[in-house]
A protein has these predicted regions:
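Acidic/charged, solvent-exposed loop-and-adjacent secondary-structure segments enriched in E/D, K/R, S/T
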Residues: 98-121
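Gly/Pro-enriched, hydrophobic low-complexity segments
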Residues: 127, 131-135, 139-207
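Short, Lys/Arg-enriched N-terminal segments with co-localized hydrophobic residues
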Residues: 1-9
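Well-ordered beta-strand positions in beta-sheet-rich domains
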Residues: 62-66, 86-88, 104-106, 162, ...
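Structural recognition of beta-strand segments within beta-rich domains
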Residues: 55-61, 66-71, 75-81, 86-89, ...
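Short hydrophobic/aromatic-rich beta-strand segments that constitute the beta-sheet cores
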Residues: 48, 69, 75-79, 94-97, ...
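Sec-dependent N-terminal signal peptides
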Residues: 13-22
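N-terminal leader/targeting segments and the immediate start of mature chains
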Residues: 20, 27-49, 53-60, 203-207
Length: 207
């Protein structure tokens, strides 16, 4: 004898269940997972190019150089174009190398130095530090994500409308939308992880 066929309503229930299993959304990529991903390498180094679009100028101001990061330890920032300047950011503050090769505390806290300190938090995935000053909105997944920072402190609201960071395994691009109508686009290239640092970077970071 042929086996009994299931009732139509049972068939519909099974079909609905199978469809729901195939269309379940993937778990959202969280800021904690992003932080862990960016903090995983022992070191990150590479090049950077920056374009600064100023309302008062027809063409962007372009700068570039090299950087080396030890997450949780320090950042060496070597601006090479259009002039040479070396900065480092560590827990004890921001320093600039003088003509004699000595590191001097950057007491003036220039805009460039403050920006480099922000990049240290961004590149190193220090979301706890970022959350002190910004509301974070993350989209995408571990392979391709975008993090939007909206200022929440009075100081940051005076400077930025928002900051948009994008990347994959590492940070690849940072866009700064500033209050005065200016805009900065920073791109990171030739990125390497867990490779020996240059002598200049080792000296700057005290290794």
């Amino acid at each position: 004898p042929t086996p009994p066929t299931p009732p139509d309503n049972m068939k519909k229930l099974l079909i609905s269940l199978l469809l729901s299993l195939t269309t379940l959304p993937t778990l959202a990529f969280s800021t904690a997972e992003l932080a862990a991903q960016l903090q995983a390498p022992q070191s990150v180094q590479g090049g950077f190019t920056q374009q600064r679009f100023l309302r008062s100028m027809d063409k962007p101001v372009q700068t570039g150089g090299r950087f080396a990061l030890r997450p949780g330890h320090g950042l060496f920032w070597h601006l090479q174009k259009p002039f040479d300047m070396k900065l480092r950011v560590r827990r004890d503050g921001i320093s600039r190398q003088d003509a004699q090769g000595q590191w001097r505390a950057n007491g003036s806290q220039t805009a460039q130095a403050a920006q480099v300190k922000l990049f240290m938090a961004v590149l190193g995935g220090d979301t706890a530090e970022l959350q002190r000053h910004f509301d974070l909105a993350l989209s995408g997944d571990a392979r391709q994500w975008q993090l939007t920072l909206t200022p929440k402190t009075a100081v940051m609201r005076q400077v930025f409308n928002k900051i948009v960071i994008s990347g994959g395994q590492l940070v690849q691009k940072v866009e700064l939308d500033e209050k005065q109508g200016d805009r900065t686009v920073m791109q990171f290239n030739q990125l390497q992880t867990n490779r020996p640092l240059s002598p200049a970077a080792r000296q700057a970071l005290g290794e």
